[in-house]
């Protein structure tokens, strides 16, 4: 959250004075709001790498690594780690408020039922070298998902936004399936189908490590640890990946491409 300060900053250009408001963040950070600079003066600011520029107003997360502070939507990470789960925190990050139980149950059910990918996507893995970087494979496969859901990836902003809830849940679900398949491809192992009777992280570990002779269903300790790890990394403020996604999505790209 931010608020406008009564203070203003004056910039003098070509013998003309221009005043700009000061914005104060919830943690006391101060910024100059120069959004009207070009319209007023014809000038723009140059700040290579955005080292001194806030790219947007955000209410999603706050990080102060030096002081060990992390908040998602205003909730301290310690509180979420003790009382929440990754999927509940993901819902919180996306929609701004902790969901009621019925809403959370519906969201979790949608995620659980969306883990499988079309069998024809299995053949995509034949085109990757065994030494290909996992992130290159993951990004390629996620982008390919859009071709299987044309109604969600039309690049028509209004149409794609009307499917946002379903698309977001689908991607949260399938990213673990694709990650597990990528790992097993690189290890030369057969793919393992998802089991929607398991938890989000339990199913991911199952798809990663189960074998025909060993079904890893009882691994609550590892599953809970992984859930906590994902919860901690649910959002990371305005880092490179977030900024890139914001830039791509602002052009109207669908959620799969973003």
Residue ranges of predicted features:
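Hydrophobic alpha-helical bundle cores within soluble ligand-binding/oligomerization subdomains
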Residues: 2-258
């Amino acid at each position: 959250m931010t608020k406008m300060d009564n203070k203003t900053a004056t910039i003098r250009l070509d013998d003309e004075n221009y005043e700009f408001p000061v914005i104060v963040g919830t943690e006391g950070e101060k910024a100059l709001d120069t959004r009207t600079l070009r319209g007023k003066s014809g000038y723009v600011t140059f700040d290579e790498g955005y080292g001194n520029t806030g790219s947007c107003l955000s209410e999603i997360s706050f990080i102060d690594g030096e002081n060990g502070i992390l908040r998602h939507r205003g909730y301290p990470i310690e509180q979420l780690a003790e009382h929440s789960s990754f999927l509940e925190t993901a819902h919180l990050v996306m929609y701004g408020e902790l969901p009621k139980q019925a809403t959370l149950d519906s969201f979790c059910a949608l995620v659980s039922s969306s883990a499988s990918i079309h069998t024809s996507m299995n053949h995509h893995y034949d085109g990757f070298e065994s030494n290909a970087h996992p992130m290159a494979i993951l990004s390629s496969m996620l982008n390919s998902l859009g071709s299987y859901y044309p109604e969600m990836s039309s690049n028509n902003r209004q149409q794609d936004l009307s499917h946002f809830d379903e698309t977001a849940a689908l991607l949260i679900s399938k990213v673990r399936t694709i990650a597990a398949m990528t790992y097993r491809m690189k290890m030369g192992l057969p793919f393992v189908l998802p089991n929607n009777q398991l938890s989000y992280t339990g199913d991911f570990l199952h798809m990663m490590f189960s074998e025909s002779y060993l079904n890893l269903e009882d691994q609550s300790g590892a599953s809970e640890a992984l859930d906590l790890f994902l919860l901690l990394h649910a959002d990371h403020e305005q880092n490179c990946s977030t900024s890139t996604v914001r830039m791509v999505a602002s052009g109207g790209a669908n959620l799969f491409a973003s």
